[in-house]
Each structure stands twice: as structure tokens, then as C-alpha cells.
Amino acid sequence: MSTPFKMERGVKYRDAAKTSIIPVKNIDPNQDLLKKPEWMKIKLPASSAKIESIKNGMRRHGLHSVCEEASCPNLHECFNHGTATFMILGAICTRRCPFCDVAHGKPLPPDPEEPQKLAETIQDMKLKYVVITSVDRDDLPDRGAGHFSECVKAVRELNPNIKIEILVPDFRGRITQALEKLKDNPPDVFNHNLENVPRLYKEIRPGADYEWSLKLLREFKEIFPNIPTKSGLMVGLGETNEEILQVMQDLRDNGVTMLTLGQYLQPSRHHLPVARYVPPTEFDEFRDKANEMGFEHAACGPFVRSSYHADLQASGGLVK
């Protein structure tokens, strides 16, 4: 009889070590992969000085960026532009979604000094708009909502003119408590991603629930009717265009005013494969449909991610 796998606290489990403990076994690391089309090829910047400067600033304060931890394809562009999405509550997620490259495991307790470190780093970088996200922390009673609130408070105290967007997890089973924690320090934009269509949730987002996520977005909007709510979807995981359009309508029906839609990219052979590459023309069609549905802003394109040019998204600029 085999010995049950036991995770060590503070250890990052990635790739095969992570996906081997996902309940739904649907990944064959030896399968043939789709060839990337021309429109999915990235041009790297000639200089990496700005990129290294941001990375070093993060390391110096013991902070993390989702750009690095999730292997975002836009890292070079965003870092070279002088922007980054900060990831609080550590770099180990309690979930093990097979599309995501963030490490899974038993995370360490939250760093009580992180809000101040974050505020000082943002001040040093002279940012005017910042996105703060986190790993899932199902191990915490409030799922990390209180820490989000403390981070927003600290950042605003040192950077009074900054605009803050938070990209939050679903606060599983603690939505009411989480929103109560956020009341004293609300963001300028509230973002929570649905990721994909409900039919594929068991395969793509084990541990999550489509209706929970809609409830979170809806109830935040009921409490803060004047704060924009935002959500994002990945395409190319086996969903149909009709299903995506229905999710977009569900978002509008629950008060969401900002949408991001981008192509899913497989971080490694141990993650879910790309089912298809969606051409740019289809993203344009999704954006047109989003505008017809009444979204105030829709960023739709192959490389669009939730926080990709988030400052431009918030100001109503075209992002694709």
C-alpha cells in the first residue's frame, strides 16, 4: 500500500508535482501540442534593464508579482513599461487549478509587515495605478480579505493620489465576511475572474463555483454601486463562443461593467493543453458584442490579461 502524499509547509509544488494531486486526471504530458500561430509570437524588448530593476525592487522588499509567479506572457512588456501586478499573501496557493502556473502547497502565515512593504515599494516606483492580487488562501478564516484591506489602507496612506485595483479570489464560503472586511478600505476597481464557462469548471477550476463567483461580484456591486466591477475570461480551453457570450451576459446581469478576454496559453506540458487558438478577428467580434451588451470597457485580444494595461483599461482606452 502506497504512503499518502504529504506536503511540507512553505514548499512550492509546481508542474508534475502539482498536477499529480489534482483530483481530475485529464492531462497527458506526452500529447502533441498545437503549433502557435504567428499572431501569438512575442517580440522581446532589446533592453532588460527596466525589467531587472523591477525584479530587484520586488526581491529587496520580499514581495511577489503575479507576472513572474504565473509566467505571464506579457511580463517583458509590462515590466519594461514600468508596471507590475503585486501578489500578496505569499506565492503558494491552496488551490491547484491545472491552467495556472502559480505554485500549490501549504502556505506560510501572512507577513504582517507586507502592507507597509508594499506601500513603500509602490512609493519608490512612483506608480499612479496599481493592481494588487493574491493566491487563494482557503487556510485563513477570512480567506485573506482582511490582509487585502490592510494593504489597500497602507498603500493609500503613503500614496494618496494612487488608483488601486484589487484582483481577488472567490473567498470560498466567506463572501459576507470578506466584503465586510473590505468596507473600510474599498478599492477604485474590484476585479474577480470567472476564468471560463461553467460547463468546464470541474476540469479547469477544481474547488471553485461559478455561482459563488457571480455572487461575489454582485454583492460587492450592491454595497459599492459607484465602484467599477471587472472580470476576465480565458478562451481556447474547449468552450464554445456561445458559452462565452452567455458568461458575458451573466456578468452584465450581475452588474459587471469591465471585461477582459484573452487567449489561454499552456504554461508547461503538465498543464491543460490549448484546445484552439482564437484568431484576433474573433476577439474583435467579442469586443463588439460586449459593447452591445453594455460593458463600459472591454479589453479583448490574444495577449489580454486581467491586469494587462489595467490603468489604460480603467481610463477607457483601447486594449487588445
UniProtKB/Swiss-Prot annotation:
Keywords: 4Fe-4S, Cytoplasm, Iron, Iron-sulfur, Metal-binding, S-adenosyl-L-methionine, Transferase. GO terms for cellular component: cytoplasm. Pathway: Protein modification; protein lipoylation via endogenous pathway; protein N(6)-(lipoyl)lysine from octanoyl-[acyl-carrier-protein]: step 2/2. Binds 2 [4Fe-4S] clusters per subunit. One cluster is coordinated with 3 cysteines and an exchangeable S-adenosyl-L-methionine. It comes from the Bacteria. Its cofactor is [4Fe-4S] cluster. Its main location: cytoplasm. It is found in: Cytoplasm. One of its GO terms (molecular function) is metal ion binding. Its EC number is 2.8.1.8. Belongs to the radical SAM superfamily. Lipoyl synthase family. NCBIfam families: lipA (TIGR00510), PRK05481.1 (NF004019), PRK12928.1 (NF009544). This is Lipoyl synthase. It comes from Haemophilus influenzae (strain ATCC 51907 / DSM 11121 / KW20 / Rd).
